[in-house]
Regions:
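Trp- and S/T/G-rich repeat-edge/linker motifs of beta-rich repeat architectures
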Residues: 1-8, 58-61, 67-70, 118-122, ...
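An edge-strand/N-cap motif at the start of beta-rich repeat modules
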Residues: 1-27, 31-39, 48, 63, ...
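Short glycine/serine- and acidic-residue-enriched loop/turn motifs that recur at repeat junctions
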Residues: 1-3, 35-58, 95-118, 155-178
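Beta-rich catalytic cores
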Residues: 10, 19-20, 72, 79-80, ...
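Acidic/polar residues in short coil/turn loops that connect beta-strands
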Residues: 19, 29, 45, 89, ...
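Conserved core positions of repeat-based scaffolds
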Residues: 21-25, 34, 82-85, 94, ...
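Acidic glycine-/aspartate-rich tracts in secreted/extracellular proteins
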Residues: 29-31, 37-40, 68, 88-91, ...
Protein backbone atom coordinates (compact mmCIF):
# COMPACT_ATOMS: atom_id res chain seq x y z
CA UNK A 1 0.00 0.00 0.00
CA UNK A 2 1.04 3.59 -0.64
CA UNK A 3 2.51 5.59 2.24
CA UNK A 4 3.81 9.09 2.70
CA UNK A 5 6.93 8.62 4.75
CA UNK A 6 8.84 11.21 6.71
CA UNK A 7 11.51 11.04 4.03
CA UNK A 8 11.94 14.33 2.15
CA UNK A 9 12.28 12.32 -1.07
CA UNK A 10 8.74 10.93 -1.02
CA UNK A 11 6.84 14.18 -0.44
CA UNK A 12 7.20 16.38 -3.51
CA UNK A 13 4.71 19.17 -2.77
CA UNK A 14 3.17 20.81 0.29
CA UNK A 15 0.46 23.46 0.36
CA UNK A 16 -0.64 25.26 3.52
CA UNK A 17 -3.76 27.26 4.31
CA UNK A 18 -2.97 30.97 4.25
CA UNK A 19 -4.23 31.31 7.81
CA UNK A 20 -2.47 28.17 8.98
CA UNK A 21 -5.44 25.95 9.78
CA UNK A 22 -4.60 22.95 7.59
CA UNK A 23 -2.18 21.60 5.04
CA UNK A 24 -1.89 18.97 2.34
CA UNK A 25 1.07 17.03 0.96
CA UNK A 26 1.45 15.16 -2.33
CA UNK A 27 3.70 12.14 -2.67
CA UNK A 28 5.86 11.36 -5.68
CA UNK A 29 3.25 8.71 -6.55
CA UNK A 30 0.50 11.35 -6.69
CA UNK A 31 -1.28 10.47 -3.46
CA UNK A 32 -2.53 13.26 -1.18
CA UNK A 33 -2.85 13.50 2.60
CA UNK A 34 -4.28 16.50 4.45
CA UNK A 35 -4.15 17.32 8.17
CA UNK A 36 -5.25 20.00 10.63
CA UNK A 37 -8.59 21.79 11.03
CA UNK A 38 -11.47 20.09 9.20
CA UNK A 39 -14.62 22.06 10.04
CA UNK A 40 -15.77 22.10 6.40
CA UNK A 41 -14.42 18.76 5.13
CA UNK A 42 -11.30 20.37 3.66
CA UNK A 43 -9.20 17.34 4.63
CA UNK A 44 -11.30 15.21 2.26
CA UNK A 45 -11.90 12.48 4.84
CA UNK A 46 -15.72 12.43 4.61
CA UNK A 47 -16.13 13.97 8.07
CA UNK A 48 -15.38 17.15 10.03
CA UNK A 49 -12.92 15.66 12.53
CA UNK A 50 -9.67 17.55 12.95
CA UNK A 51 -6.61 15.39 12.20
CA UNK A 52 -3.26 15.65 14.01
CA UNK A 53 -4.43 17.11 17.31
CA UNK A 54 -4.44 13.70 19.04
CA UNK A 55 -2.09 10.73 19.14
CA UNK A 56 -2.48 8.08 16.45
CA UNK A 57 -3.91 10.44 13.82
CA UNK A 58 -0.82 10.89 11.66
CA UNK A 59 1.47 8.55 9.74
CA UNK A 60 -0.23 5.36 8.64
CA UNK A 61 -3.39 6.41 10.52
CA UNK A 62 -3.86 9.54 8.39
CA UNK A 63 -6.18 8.72 5.49
CA UNK A 64 -5.38 9.48 1.87
CA UNK A 65 -7.70 11.90 0.09
CA UNK A 66 -9.78 9.72 -2.27
CA UNK A 67 -9.46 11.31 -5.71
CA UNK A 68 -11.27 8.67 -7.76
CA UNK A 69 -10.54 5.28 -9.30
CA UNK A 70 -7.04 5.11 -10.76
CA UNK A 71 -6.58 8.88 -10.33
CA UNK A 72 -3.49 10.56 -8.93
CA UNK A 73 -2.65 14.21 -8.29
CA UNK A 74 0.04 16.11 -10.17
CA UNK A 75 -0.44 19.26 -8.08
CA UNK A 76 -2.30 20.46 -4.98
CA UNK A 77 -3.30 23.88 -3.69
CA UNK A 78 -5.21 24.93 -0.58
CA UNK A 79 -7.19 28.08 0.20
CA UNK A 80 -8.49 29.21 3.57
CA UNK A 81 -10.84 26.24 4.03
CA UNK A 82 -10.83 24.42 0.68
CA UNK A 83 -8.39 22.37 -1.35
CA UNK A 84 -7.98 21.53 -5.03
CA UNK A 85 -6.02 18.83 -6.83
CA UNK A 86 -4.93 18.76 -10.45
CA UNK A 87 -5.31 15.15 -11.53
CA UNK A 88 -3.14 13.10 -13.85
CA UNK A 89 -5.54 13.38 -16.81
CA UNK A 90 -5.90 17.18 -16.51
CA UNK A 91 -9.11 17.44 -14.51
CA UNK A 92 -9.45 19.50 -11.32
CA UNK A 93 -11.27 18.36 -8.18
CA UNK A 94 -11.93 20.65 -5.21
CA UNK A 95 -13.39 19.99 -1.76
CA UNK A 96 -14.04 21.73 1.55
CA UNK A 97 -15.85 24.99 2.23
CA UNK A 98 -17.87 26.31 -0.69
CA UNK A 99 -19.58 29.46 0.60
CA UNK A 100 -18.58 31.46 -2.49
CA UNK A 101 -18.50 28.72 -5.14
CA UNK A 102 -14.74 28.22 -4.76
CA UNK A 103 -15.18 24.48 -5.46
CA UNK A 104 -16.54 25.26 -8.94
CA UNK A 105 -19.63 23.07 -8.63
CA UNK A 106 -22.25 25.70 -9.49
CA UNK A 107 -23.58 25.74 -5.92
CA UNK A 108 -22.51 26.58 -2.36
CA UNK A 109 -22.63 23.07 -0.88
CA UNK A 110 -19.47 22.10 0.99
CA UNK A 111 -17.92 18.79 -0.05
CA UNK A 112 -15.79 16.34 1.90
CA UNK A 113 -17.61 16.61 5.21
CA UNK A 114 -19.90 13.59 4.71
CA UNK A 115 -19.75 10.03 3.39
CA UNK A 116 -19.94 9.36 -0.35
CA UNK A 117 -18.76 12.85 -1.35
CA UNK A 118 -15.16 12.12 -2.35
CA UNK A 119 -13.44 9.79 -4.80
CA UNK A 120 -15.62 8.79 -7.75
CA UNK A 121 -18.55 10.69 -6.18
CA UNK A 122 -16.65 14.00 -6.42
CA UNK A 123 -17.27 15.65 -9.79
CA UNK A 124 -14.46 17.40 -11.59
CA UNK A 125 -14.69 21.16 -12.11
CA UNK A 126 -16.23 21.94 -15.51
CA UNK A 127 -13.47 23.89 -17.24
CA UNK A 128 -15.20 24.04 -20.64
CA UNK A 129 -15.64 21.86 -23.71
CA UNK A 130 -12.53 19.77 -24.37
CA UNK A 131 -10.51 21.79 -21.85
CA UNK A 132 -8.06 20.43 -19.30
CA UNK A 133 -5.83 22.12 -16.74
CA UNK A 134 -2.05 22.25 -16.61
CA UNK A 135 -1.70 24.22 -13.34
CA UNK A 136 -3.90 25.20 -10.40
CA UNK A 137 -3.82 27.87 -7.71
CA UNK A 138 -6.12 28.81 -4.84
CA UNK A 139 -6.70 32.03 -2.97
CA UNK A 140 -8.58 32.59 0.26
CA UNK A 141 -12.02 31.94 -1.25
CA UNK A 142 -11.31 31.41 -4.97
CA UNK A 143 -9.57 28.98 -7.29
CA UNK A 144 -7.90 29.27 -10.70
CA UNK A 145 -6.70 26.91 -13.41
CA UNK A 146 -4.27 27.45 -16.26
CA UNK A 147 -5.84 25.58 -19.16
CA UNK A 148 -4.28 23.56 -21.95
CA UNK A 149 -5.03 26.36 -24.46
CA UNK A 150 -3.06 28.90 -22.39
CA UNK A 151 -6.12 30.62 -20.95
CA UNK A 152 -6.81 31.10 -17.24
CA UNK A 153 -10.20 30.57 -15.59
CA UNK A 154 -11.00 31.49 -11.99
CA UNK A 155 -14.09 30.94 -9.83
CA UNK A 156 -15.26 31.77 -6.31
CA UNK A 157 -15.37 35.06 -4.41
CA UNK A 158 -14.80 38.11 -6.61
CA UNK A 159 -15.36 41.09 -4.30
CA UNK A 160 -12.10 42.76 -5.39
CA UNK A 161 -12.08 41.53 -8.99
CA UNK A 162 -9.72 38.68 -8.11
CA UNK A 163 -11.31 36.45 -10.77
CA UNK A 164 -10.09 38.79 -13.51
CA UNK A 165 -13.40 38.83 -15.40
CA UNK A 166 -14.00 42.58 -15.58
CA UNK A 167 -16.54 42.82 -12.78
CA UNK A 168 -16.95 41.97 -9.09
CA UNK A 169 -19.54 39.18 -9.47
CA UNK A 170 -18.83 35.89 -7.73
CA UNK A 171 -18.72 32.86 -10.06
CA UNK A 172 -19.17 29.14 -9.44
CA UNK A 173 -21.88 29.52 -6.81
CA UNK A 174 -24.89 29.08 -9.14
CA UNK A 175 -25.90 27.04 -12.19
CA UNK A 176 -24.67 28.07 -15.65
CA UNK A 177 -21.56 29.84 -14.38
CA UNK A 178 -18.89 27.23 -15.06
CA UNK A 179 -17.59 25.46 -18.17
CA UNK A 180 -18.05 27.40 -21.39
CA UNK A 181 -20.09 30.00 -19.46
CA UNK A 182 -17.08 30.96 -17.34
CA UNK A 183 -15.15 33.80 -18.97
CA UNK A 184 -11.36 33.43 -19.09
CA UNK A 185 -9.14 36.06 -17.50
CA UNK A 186 -8.46 38.76 -20.13
CA UNK A 187 -4.69 39.24 -20.14
CA UNK A 188 -4.56 40.94 -23.54
CA UNK A 189 -2.45 39.81 -26.47
Amino acid sequence: SETLSSSPYDVVEVSLSEIGKFGCARSSQGHVKCWGYNGYGQLGHGNTSTASDDENEMGEDLAFVPLGSNRTATSISVGENHACALLDEGSVKCWGRNNYGQLGMGNTTQIGDGPDEMGDFLAAVDLGTNRSATEIATGQHHSCALLDDGSVKCWGLNNYGQLGIGNASTRGNAANQMGDDLVAVDLGT
